[in-house]
UniProtKB/Swiss-Prot annotation:
It comes from Salmonella agona (strain SL483). The lineage of its organism: Bacteria, Pseudomonadati, Pseudomonadota, Gammaproteobacteria, Enterobacterales. It is an enzyme of class 4 (lyase). It holds the Pfam family His_biosynth. Heterodimer of HisH and HisF. It comes from the Bacteria. This is Imidazole glycerol phosphate synthase subunit HisF. Pathway: Amino-acid biosynthesis; L-histidine biosynthesis; L-histidine from 5-phospho-alpha-D-ribose 1-diphosphate: step 5/9. Keywords: Amino-acid biosynthesis, Cytoplasm, Histidine biosynthesis, Lyase.
Length: 258
């Protein structure tokens, strides 16, 4: 059995790490490189960096900080933000990233997933899915350009359909960003995770809602996700990664102990 992964998420805007609630009202957390090093030292299994306004601004993630992060950490990390071509991805990987993640650009052109997977291998290609539960319809819908609340829009895709589509296109991993839960720290949306897990054959990462160690346990035990991504509980030092891993191991979760 592969070990479950604990993954801090660093949302980047204007060269700094920020954090919002339900993808809105972002506050500045701190500088990118020191936070990355802190999480690596605490025992994170990997890191994810999202340049949250790159896609909506029509630009590619700033590669200068990617190189600086690669110099100070020795764990895998994934970078996302406005990647629209093989050349964009190649440059980010050449600066030291281990994976690249695409979200809004994949919704604009789903063939991008296949082209990237063919060039770099599926293990390198992550698709992020920003999903919102609509109380009126009782369905989960995929959103686009979520880094800018003034440009965010609901797409034609229902979440489960898009999960299946990106796998067929060549996604090697899926990060499910559950927008309703984001930043509120009352637990992952287990109902949605279970539905997605039923149709997801590639590694599935839960994102949005972690507030306690028990929330991580529930995601691993009840929804069988491969990794759990979180931000505010780590940024605000509510949960220490080493202590979290010790707790999960004590509950029988296969986890890498540092």
């Amino acid at each position: 059995m592969l070990a479950k992964r604990i993954i801090p998420c660093l949302d980047v805007r204007d060269g700094q790490v920020v954090k919002g609630v339900q993808f809105r009202n972002h506050e500045i957390i701190g500088d990118i490189v020191p936070l990355a090093k802190r999480y690596a030292d605490e025992g994170a299994d990997e890191l994810v960096f999202y340049d949250i306004t790159a896609s909506s601004d029509g630009r590619v993630v700033d590669k200068s900080w990617v190189a600086r992060v690669a110099e100070v950490i020795d764990i895998p990390f994934c970078v996302a933000g406005g990647i629209r071509s093989i050349d964009d991805a190649a440059k980010i990987l050449s600066f030291g990233a281990d994976k690249i993640s695409i979200n809004s650009p994949a919704l604009a052109d789903s063939t991008l997933i296949t082209r990237l997977a063919d060039r770099f291998g599926v293990q390198c290609i992550v698709v992020g899915i920003d999903t919102w539960f609509d109380d009126a319809t009782g369905k989960y819908h995929v959103n686009q350009y979520t880094g800018d609340e003034n440009r965010t829009r609901v797409t034609q895709w229902e979440t489960l359909d898009w999960v299946q589509e990106v796998q067929q296109r060549g996604a090697g991993e899926i990060v499910l960003n559950m927008m309703n839960q984001d930043g509120v720290r009352n637990g992952y949306d287990l109902t949605q995770l279970k539905k997605v897990r039923d149709v997801c054959r590639v590694p599935l990462i839960a994102s949005g809602g972690a507030g306690t160690m028990e929330h991580f346990l529930e995601a691993f035990r009840d929804a069988d996700v491969d990794g759990a991504l979180a931000a505010s509980v780590f940024h605000k030092q509510i949960i220490n990664i080493g202590e979290l891993k010790a707790y999960l191991a004590g509950q029988g979760v296969e986890i890498r102990i540092c």
